[in-house]
Design a protein with these regions (language model features):
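Catalytic phosphate/metal-binding cores of nucleic-acid and nucleotide-processing enzymes, i.e., regions
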Residues: 2-145
Length: 146
């Protein structure tokens, strides 16, 4: 995907400057991320190596081209909602998830060097379900989402 500045786009298309991104809750952001991943469920995405072994500063700066996070960052709606880049730390902040949750979606130790987008989508959707339904029932519901 080729990224263009607003000025470049204005040369070839009508661009509205008054667009206001609808405020999305963290759970709505997670569901959108899962939907984006499900658009091409067989797409092979890259994982991040050893997220659990890196100190926080290194882990937060980790990124990879064609990762589940980069799919989210390519989405103009999520960018308009405040997603700043495709790093691990930004995904953690923007989606308001734990290191454990992101580890379960992204880490090499679970999937090797690549993960199918559909599998990542199920993991992201399970996180969203747990966020909506905290406690025991949330864990039960998220187990069936996988």
């Amino acid at each position: 995907m080729e990224h263009k500045t607003v000025e470049q786009l204005k040369r070839v298309a009508e661009v509205r400057d008054d667009f206001q991104a609808e405020a999305l809750t963290p759970t709505q952001r997670l569901y959108r991320w899962a939907d984006l991943l499900e658009e091409r469920p067989d797409r092979r995405l890259t994982t991040l190596y050893g997220t659990e072994y890196e100190d926080e500063a290194v882990r937060n700066s980790m990124r990879s081209d064609d990762s589940p996070i980069s799919i989210a960052f390519e989405d103009p709606v999520l960018r308009a909602a405040g997603m700043k880049d495709d790093t691990y730390g930004e995904a953690k902040r923007f989606f308001e998830v734990s290191d454990k949750d992101l580890h379960d979606v992204l880490c090499y130790c679970h999937y090797g060097s690549g993960i199918q987008a559909g599998i990542a989508a199920r993991s992201v959707r399970a996180i969203a379900i747990r966020a909506e339904n905290p406690g025991l029932m949330g864990r039960v519901r998220s187990a069936f989402a996988l």
